[in-house]
Regions:
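Structural alpha/beta surface segment adjacent to cysteine/selenocysteine redox centers
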Residues: 1-75
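C-terminal cap of thioredoxin/glutaredoxin-like
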Residues: 1-6, 71-151
Length: 151
């Protein structure tokens, strides 16, 4: 759906990814770190790694921490696996994840816990100029985008 939005609004929409690793997803922080490390390789590395890990999240979620699914995915994506391993050792990636987490947490109560008002939160979260669309359909997003463009 994000690709559809970017196609329809190529000059009006910018997608920004932020890490918000939930405690219930034991590999979430590591997945975010792999995406940030992949970003250093250019060629839209963050998005490619993020989407590959997210598309395979059920497998990824159940893995032990020492398994190498992200490295396998990186190789399939044509990334330099040795460089990815080196970049994963950089503490700056952990710092960035912490900063993004704290930034999103500061948005309010909905980000403070995984359950808010009895409703389980879902990630990823989407905001359009600070507004969260009701629903995750192309039409729901387009409605908010159109409203924002009129402002």
């Amino acid at each position: 759906m994000i690709e559809q939005i970017l196609e329809k609004y190529p000059n009006d929409v910018k997608v920004v990814f932020k890490n918000f690793p939930l405690g219930s997803h034991k590999q979430a922080r590591k997945a975010g770190k792999y995406a940030l490390a992949a970003d250093r390789q250019g060629d839209n590395g963050f998005k490619k790694m993020f989407m590959a890990l997210f598309d395979d999240k059920d497998t990824w979620r159940g893995l032990r921490s020492d398994e190498d699914l992200p490295l396998k995915l990186a190789a399939e994506l044509g990334m330099n696996v040795d460089q990815l391993k080196r970049d994963m050792q950089d503490p700056a990636l952990d710092t960035q994840i912490d900063q993004e987490y704290n930034q999103l947490k500061s948005l309010g109560n909905a980000y403070e816990t995984e359950n808010f008002a009895g409703v389980r939160l879902a990630v990823p979260k989407f905001f359009i100029n600070g507004r969260e669309p009701v629903g995750r359909s192309f039409d729901a997003f387009s409605k908010v985008i159109e409203e924002e463009l009129k402002k």
